[in-house]
């Protein structure tokens, strides 16, 4: 049993800094400003479910999928970096509102009638929480743990789902508490957080790309 607790603790120590639920909360605040409480709670729950599912797939089938499609870890990092940077640019330079012409009003009403955009999978679950770094760590750790012999087989079987569930629950709790943060900072504060997070996401995306390129250089040098 101590081996199980040790494995769970080690997994959380490795994954939580990469998943960084607090960063996802700040991103959520920037994207969910126009959502009501019910919709924010639904997005929070779905994001947590998606994070759990992504981590499970990455652990049990990640290497197989990447080998099947010929995807390397550097390629995963570069692709994730491009997605993160694109999302950051959209947050940093939001689309300007159209002039209040009859055509603009008509289009605004038409857009208002559409369902609220689903932000649970992209960008909250991926790449913000279960991003390329998290997925790469899970895939590499899965290979190391299975062949390392440090833990008994039953621990290797039981611990990963518990670790991933714990990360998902922590994320859900953080996102659910974002409503109190929204009431505290107000609309202006949310816009400021959105711009700041956009800039940070662009920086993160560029860094992901740099890391991927450096890994390629090291691999083929």
UniProtKB/Swiss-Prot annotation:
Residues 1-7, 67-68, 140-154, 218-221 are periplasmic. It is found in: Cell inner membrane. NCBIfam families: NAAT family transporter, PRK10995.1. The chain crosses the membrane at residues 8-28, 46-66, 69-89, 119-139, 155-175, 197-217. Residues 29-45, 90-118, 176-196 are cytoplasmic. Belongs to the UPF0056 (MarC) family. PANTHER family: UPF0056 INNER MEMBRANE PROTEIN MARC, UPF0056 MEMBRANE PROTEIN YHCE. Keywords: Cell inner membrane, Cell membrane, Membrane, Transmembrane, Transmembrane helix. This is UPF0056 inner membrane protein MarC.
């Amino acid at each position: 049993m101590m081996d199980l607790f040790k494995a769970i603790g080690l997994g959380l120590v490795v994954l939580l800094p990469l998943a960084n639920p607090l960063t996802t909360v700040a991103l959520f605040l920037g994207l969910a400003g126009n959502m009501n409480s019910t919709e924010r709670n639904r997005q929070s729950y779905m994001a947590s479910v998606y994070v759990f599912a992504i981590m499970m797939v990455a652990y049990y089938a990640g290497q197989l999928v990447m080998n099947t499609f010929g995807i390397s870890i550097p390629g995963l990092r570069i692709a994730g970096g491009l997605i993160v940077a694109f999302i950051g640019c959209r947050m940093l330079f939001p689309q300007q509102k159209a002039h209040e012409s009859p055509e603009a009003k008509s289009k605004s009403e038409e857009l208002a009638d559409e369902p609220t955009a689903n932000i649970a999978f992209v960008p909250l679950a991926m790449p913000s929480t279960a991003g390329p770094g998290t997925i790469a760590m899970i895939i590499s750790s899965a290979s190391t743990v299975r062949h390392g012999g440090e833990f008994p087989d039953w621990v290797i079987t039981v611990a990963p789902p518990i670790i991933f569930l714990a990360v998902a629950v922590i994320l859900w709790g953080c996102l659910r508490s974002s409503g109190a943060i929204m009431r505290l900072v107000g609309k202006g504060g949310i816009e400021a957080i959105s711009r700041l997070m956009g800039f940070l996401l662009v920086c993160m995306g560029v860094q992901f790309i740099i890391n991927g390129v450096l890994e390629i250089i090291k691999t083929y040098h």
